[in-house]
Amino acid sequence: MTEFRRFQTEKSKDIKDYPFLLPKCYDTIKVPRVLSTMSETADVQVLRSVSNWSSLINHTEDSIQQAYLSLIANSRHCIYIENQFFVSMINSNEVNNEICRVLCDRIKRAYYENEVFRVYILLPLLPGFEGDVGAPGGSALQAVLHWTFLSLSRGPNSLIGNLKKLVPDPMKYIKVCSLRTWDILCGKLVTELIYIHCKCMIVDDKYTIIGSANINDRSQCGNRDSEVCIVVKDTEFVASKMNGRPYQAGKFALSLRRHLMQEHLGMLPEQAARLGGRPAPNIDLDDPVIDSFFFDTWGAIAKKNTQIYEEVFRVYPTDMVESFDELKAWQSQMPMSEYSPQLAEEQLRQLTGSLVEFPLNFLLKANLAPGLASKEGLVPTSVFT
């Protein structure tokens, strides 16, 4: 509504066909009885990223970022993040949002205080931009990859790079994963990444942020893209577990995290056809912190699935490729899906869901930043951050 009013004030204030919109009042609406048995109560707050240019307010509001920072800093057990982008750096002059810094501080605190603490991050395997990696038309795609890797694992301003200075094994606390699927198309085995477009964070199975905001400056700083989210604080609780101990989890946050993990691990009823007659995996999802789930289930399944896809399709991005020359050599070899499709399908039937590892070492030795002579190199870096 504020966007419409801004447009109306600037562009069409004298056109009577576009009247001011007034907020509706819903005080008199009765919730149908059937819905009352299907829903839970919760405290919900609307969050925004807006400023003068987007909503004609006299200040910059970054309540979305502030909610992220507060929930991360005050988390006790577990953070689950799914997002389309992850561009956030520590002590950077080019990226200003502080999500990465607060994540790093929270993991450091867990290390110093000997806490069992987990962070799950799910991102698309590749950004949703035109072109192919290593091709002339793929500069925009590579630019986003460049900033993603600088944020996660490469260089002194990255999350994992900072953690390695103090924490012997940062991956004890973090799992960065993605999603991939396969099918038979026109009699041929094919694969494609599942593009994660979700923007949510679930903290301690009690707090949830859902909305339109990506993890980057464009969405978080308030003075750029306008965004809206909600933060949900559960007020109804159910018995669950954290690190093997009894725990009161929020009904909504727990059910959302469980459903997302069920989907990624192939546990939903509609995913049974993928199993080739095997029973659906029976995995206890209540405790996301305990070692047996974090390492032996989530991490092990992601690793096994990644290995199968690499063997069957020679997919990329992959940690097996650290330079553009290695990428060409990797792609030049015939995949199992072509020289032995029957064996390949047998291998694919051993997959568990769609979870795969995010390849943090992909093109590690290559420069993914756009060339200065390219159109991507001529625009401000803020376009990609």
Feature locations, PLM:
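Charged, low-complexity intrinsically disordered terminal segments
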Residues: 1-385
